[in-house]
Amino acid sequence: MTLFHFGNCFALAYFPYFITYKCSGLSEYNAFWKCVQAGVTYLFVQLCKMLFLATFFPTWEGGIYDFIGEFMKASVDVADLIGLNLVMSRNAGKGEYKIMVAALGWATAELIMSRCIPLWVGARGIEFDWKYIQMSIDSNISLVHYIVASAQVWMITRYDLYHTFRPAVLLLMFLSVYKAFVMETFVHLCSLGSWTALLARAVVTGLLALSTLALYVAVVNVHS
């Protein structure tokens, strides 16, 4: 039973990444090592973020939720956008190729570093726990989030981007950076359960993805 539960969680967490890699055409471009390089960049960026947070934003131990402190901590996620831009700038090819390489490498590195050990240790436990299913579903939401963020970075860094599109792209980037903070604050204020919070995050990420996709299609069509 424990191995079956672990297998379900593992498949739910990792197979969408594998399917994305195969169906996006990255395997035809031999982009595996490009994704690995993106993952290494992810590790470097996260190390810099942790050092920055540990230095300037020590852990809040009070009983009251620190909105300003959490907002400032969320601002550090801008480093992820800088890292994604660095990865895409080092890869030659079409826009969609750069976006998928950066997003898939980034999201896979996060999946391995933040969810691999908890799944291996926890999902193989004697007692069944829904939180590991939730963790696996959340990894798929993270994949969509990083694809969206990569597309936004790609659009804003185009030198020929029409000025009419720039405010919309900047707004979507702002929402991507502070989405986690807004969701955490909303969950804290409304005292939402774990499944409700996961559903809310999936809905918000989906709406952000659809908005970014519509803008991406408009940008590509205008510049084609």
Swiss-Prot record:
<keyword id="KW-0539">Nucleus</keyword>
<dbReference type="GO" id="GO:0160064">
    <property type="term" value="C:multi-pass translocon complex"/>
</dbReference>
<feature type="transmembrane region" description="Helical">
    <location>
        <begin position="1"/>
        <end position="21"/>
    </location>
</feature>
<dbReference type="GO" id="GO:0043022">
    <property type="term" value="F:ribosome binding"/>
</dbReference>
<feature type="transmembrane region" description="Helical">
    <location>
        <begin position="35"/>
        <end position="58"/>
    </location>
</feature>
<feature type="topological domain" description="Cytoplasmic">
    <location>
        <begin position="22"/>
        <end position="34"/>
    </location>
</feature>
<dbReference type="GO" id="GO:0031965">
    <property type="term" value="C:nuclear membrane"/>
</dbReference>
<dbReference type="InterPro" id="IPR019164">
    <property type="entry name" value="TMEM147"/>
</dbReference>
<feature type="topological domain" description="Cytoplasmic">
    <location>
        <begin position="89"/>
        <end position="98"/>
    </location>
</feature>
<keyword id="KW-0812">Transmembrane</keyword>
<feature type="topological domain" description="Lumenal">
    <location>
        <begin position="59"/>
        <end position="66"/>
    </location>
</feature>
<feature type="transmembrane region" description="Helical">
    <location>
        <begin position="165"/>
        <end position="187"/>
    </location>
</feature>
<comment type="similarity">
    <text>Belongs to the TMEM147 family.</text>
</comment>
<dbReference type="GO" id="GO:0160063">
    <property type="term" value="P:multi-pass transmembrane protein insertion into ER membrane"/>
</dbReference>
<dbReference type="GO" id="GO:0036228">
    <property type="term" value="P:protein localization to nuclear inner membrane"/>
</dbReference>
<dbReference type="GO" id="GO:0005886">
    <property type="term" value="C:plasma membrane"/>
</dbReference>
<feature type="topological domain" description="Lumenal">
    <location>
        <begin position="125"/>
        <end position="129"/>
    </location>
</feature>
<comment type="function">
    <text>Component of the multi-pass translocon (MPT) complex that mediates insertion of multi-pass membrane proteins into the lipid bilayer of membranes. The MPT complex takes over after the SEC61 complex: following membrane insertion of the first few transmembrane segments of proteins by the SEC61 complex, the MPT complex occludes the lateral gate of the SEC61 complex to promote insertion of subsequent transmembrane regions. Also acts as a negative regulator of CHRM3 function, most likely by interfering with its trafficking to the cell membrane.</text>
</comment>
<keyword id="KW-0472">Membrane</keyword>
<dbReference type="GO" id="GO:0005789">
    <property type="term" value="C:endoplasmic reticulum membrane"/>
</dbReference>
<feature type="transmembrane region" description="Helical">
    <location>
        <begin position="130"/>
        <end position="155"/>
    </location>
</feature>
<keyword id="KW-1003">Cell membrane</keyword>
<dbReference type="GO" id="GO:0032991">
    <property type="term" value="C:protein-containing complex"/>
</dbReference>
<feature type="transmembrane region" description="Helical">
    <location>
        <begin position="195"/>
        <end position="216"/>
    </location>
</feature>
<feature type="transmembrane region" description="Helical">
    <location>
        <begin position="99"/>
        <end position="124"/>
    </location>
</feature>
<feature type="topological domain" description="Cytoplasmic">
    <location>
        <begin position="156"/>
        <end position="164"/>
    </location>
</feature>
<keyword id="KW-0256">Endoplasmic reticulum</keyword>
<feature type="topological domain" description="Lumenal">
    <location>
        <begin position="188"/>
        <end position="194"/>
    </location>
</feature>
<feature type="transmembrane region" description="Helical">
    <location>
        <begin position="67"/>
        <end position="88"/>
    </location>
</feature>
<keyword id="KW-1133">Transmembrane helix</keyword>
<comment type="subunit">
    <text>Component of the back of Sec61 (BOS) complex, composed of NCLN/Nicalin, NOMO (NOMO1, NOMO2 or NOMO3) and TMEM147. The BOS complex is part of the multi-pass translocon (MPT) complex, composed of three subcomplexes, the GEL complex (composed of RAB5IF/OPTI and TMCO1), the BOS complex (composed of NCLN/Nicalin, NOMO and TMEM147) and the PAT complex (composed of WDR83OS/Asterix and CCDC47). The MPT complex associates with the SEC61 complex. Interacts with CHRM3, CHRM1 and AVPR2. Interacts with LBR; promoting LBR localization to the nucleus inner membrane. Interacts with DHCR7.</text>
</comment>
<feature type="topological domain" description="Cytoplasmic">
    <location>
        <begin position="217"/>
        <end position="224"/>
    </location>
</feature>
<dbReference type="Pfam" id="PF09767">
    <property type="entry name" value="DUF2053"/>
</dbReference>
<protein>
    <recommendedName>
        <fullName>BOS complex subunit TMEM147</fullName>
    </recommendedName>
</protein>
